[in-house]
Amino acid sequence: MKKRILAGILCGAVVLSLVGCGSKDKESTSALGTSATQAAASDTTADNSASDAASDTTATETAAPVADYSDDENINQYSAFAVRSESLHDGHWDDENSNAGSNKSLSPDLSWDPVEGASCYVVYMVDVSANYFLHWKQDNITEPKVAEGFSDRRHYVGPYPPKGSTHNYVVYVIALKNPVEKIQGSLRDGCPQIGDFIKALDTDKDGNTGNILGAGKISGLFKDNV
């Protein structure tokens, strides 16, 4: 009888031990599953953060530069827009744009974003190294771009500084609500009053003021090595 009781006690102990082990295994498995889930969530969060950071960097790198002409009294009172040119390389105008030697004297390529409300644009180019010598005056441009060679010799003459010297040539693009009667300035002449010529564009051909909607600018150097 005692042996049977002892055997029963031993069997009960074994069963309890097995139940306890199973419970611990379940707890361990549950703990491992929880840890794996947390790790996966952490990795996903890290991946999302990295993706967001990459997007922010890309947006910053591809954002268009903001035009700032606050240091140019000729146009700093107008809304600014950026001007681009494929005729500029390393800050210098191409030889094809020059009138030096046998160069072609082609007016430069220009482009800019459309200005809201503008029906036309005016372009001026001056040599700021030589008393604002006027190289380009073109009106009635109806698209936000001009191809290289757009202007003929009545409206454009390319840079031709003294041999061996480097001059700085500034192009102004003025956005107008309406056309004007006439743009001022004489080609191949010094125009230190270029600011006044630009201000005159603020009155359209019918005498209405407030005609200038914005102004853009781009500049480049040219050195005569011919």
Q: Model-found features: residue ranges?
A:
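N-terminus-centered regions that define maturation/targeting leaders and the start
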Residues: 22-39, 47, 54-226
